[in-house]
Amino acid sequence: MTAVGTPLDYTHVGMYELGKALTRPTRGKAITGLLRIFGGIPAPVVRTAYRATAWQREVRKPAYILRNADDPNALARMQAIDRFQQTMPGYPGKVSEEMWENFVYHGELARGELHFGDRVLDLTAITQPIQLFGSHRDAIAAWPAAHHGVDLFRGSERVEFMTVDASHLG
């Protein structure tokens, strides 16, 4: 099993911790309610959020273009990320609700116990080898959030973690 830039413990992702703190009086239901009203997270909101988390990239983009004007590979990577961000889909209603409530607010993913109706998936019981990747430059899945898998997948015969030098989108 492989996980690339996957936040396995959302307590290490600042924007989610802020959301939890702000909605604590409603036990997280304020965000769940908004997700239901909007049918999930609309694509323009997802796109704006991804760009906002990498605001430094946006500010530095003109200098990056000038610095790499003679490097077609660097410019192609930048354009690929821009195209990806411009076409990002939204998150559908039920999926976004489950992710918010179970993964983020209640921390099920971090504990390794996912609830799907009457079923419980115990991630700590996975025995297959696992390869994880994380980056200190990832604004979406902070390095500690991705590295959490080293402790989480304790039933695996082998868990390897590799730190890469890249943003969440490459």
Q: Where on the chain are the PLM-derived regions?
A:
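Alpha/beta-hydrolase-fold enzymes
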Residues: 1-94
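Short acidic (Asp/Glu) and glycine-rich catalytic loops that position anionic groups and cofactors
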Residues: 75-82, 128, 163-166
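Active-site nucleophile elbow and catalytic-triad environment of alpha/beta-hydrolase enzymes
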Residues: 104-122
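Short beta-strand/loop motif that positions the catalytic acidic residue
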Residues: 126, 132-134, 138
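Conserved alpha/beta-hydrolase "acid-adjacent" motif
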Residues: 139-145
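Catalytic histidine neighborhood in serine/cysteine hydrolases
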Residues: 146, 151-169
